[in-house]
Regions:
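Serine-hydrolase catalytic machinery in alpha/beta-hydrolase-like enzymes
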Residues: 12-45, 50-147, 245
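Short alpha-helix in the alpha/beta-hydrolase fold that links the catalytic acid
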Residues: 92-93, 212-222
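Alpha/beta-hydrolase fold nucleophile elbow
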Residues: 147-158
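Gly/Ala-rich beta-loop-alpha elbow adjacent to hydrolase catalytic centers
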Residues: 157-161, 165
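Acidic catalytic loop of the alpha/beta-hydrolase fold
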Residues: 207-211
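C-terminal catalytic histidine-bearing segment of alpha/beta-hydrolase fold enzymes
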Residues: 226-271
């Protein structure tokens, strides 16, 4: 990862310019401390969800937690992890979405860290910072290939995964039917955004310093320039307010955001 000279990590400012810079926030103490460490938790799926592997274009394999639709379906929801990795909270969230979508959609929570899972801030920061964009893209492309050429794919993610939810939609091409990003770093390049084949629902936190209101405003402007549709909601909340692994999540804001995301995803995947 290359740090742009114009980007600084003073704890009082810090607006990352792209996903690579966002990952370097792992070195920022204020950013690390904005993530409460998850409590120990073991998830047992009640709907047949299980870990699986899929091939990636670079000749390797990647991991995912898959909940198969009750009846054969080409519809998929990709779930992108927080900076902790594909932990049991994300698996639980994947099953929550599986049930919310009435078991009619395949739900795949994608392991972006190749098996590494953090339980503390130091390890989470280390894993996020070490994640290499070429490999991350290969993992996403492998998941898209697994879904198949005729798949209809929507995505959702938080923080690190919020940025990758949008990048996933870009990589999905014509298979993309929806994208929900929770306080993730938006893609800034208008030419890239022009290739989007779906609209975007962006859920953001008004009290945070990193994916700030200014970053959101720039994203809206860039999407307009790209002639793409985006709906944004800025909650009066802190970064990570709705993270599945957050033991101190904002209950009211999380519930409202979930309802927004649910209405959006049901419209794109069930209608």
């Amino acid at each position: 990862l290359v740090l742009k000279p114009s980007f600084t990590f003073a704890q009082s400012c810090c607006e990352p310019q792209n996903q690579a810079d966002f990952q370097l926030l792992a070195d920022n103490k204020a950013f690390r401390m904005s993530h409460d460490e998850p409590r120990p938790f073991t998830f047992v799926s009640l709907t047949g969800g299980e870990m699986m592997t899929f091939k990636t274009p670079d000749g390797k394999t990647a991991n995912g937690f898959l909940l198969k639709a009750k009846s054969k379906s080409k519809k998929y929801l990709f779930v992108y992890q927080e900076w902790w990795g594909l932990n049991d909270y994300i698996k639980q969230e994947a099953e929550k979405w599986y049930n919310e979508l009435d078991g009619q959609v395949n739900v795949l929570a994608i392991d972006m860290y190749d098996g590494k899972i953090a339980t503390n801030r130091d390890d989470a920061g280390k894993y996020m910072k070490e994640a290499q964009e070429p490999r991350l893209e290969q993992i996403v492309k492998g998941a898209i290939d697994f879904a198949g050429r005729r798949a209809k794919i929507a995505s959702i993610g938080w923080c690190f995964g919020g940025g990758w939810s949008l990048k996933s939609a870009l990589l999905e091409g014509k298979r993309a039917v929806g994208c929900v990003m929770y306080y993730g770093m938006p893609v800034k390049e208008v030419e890239k955004l022009k290739t989007l084949r779906t609209d975007v629902l962006g859920i953001f936190a008004g009290r945070e310093k990193w994916i700030s209101k200014e970053v959101v405003a720039d994203f809206e402007k860039n999407m307009k320039s790209a002639e793409k549709s985006v709906t944004t909601k800025i909650f009066d909340a802190e970064h990570a307010f709705a993270n599945p692994s957050n033991p101190n999540f904002d209950k009211a804001a999380t519930a409202e955001a979930f309802k927004m995301a649910s209405n959006y995803l049901k419209t794109r995947l069930l209608n």
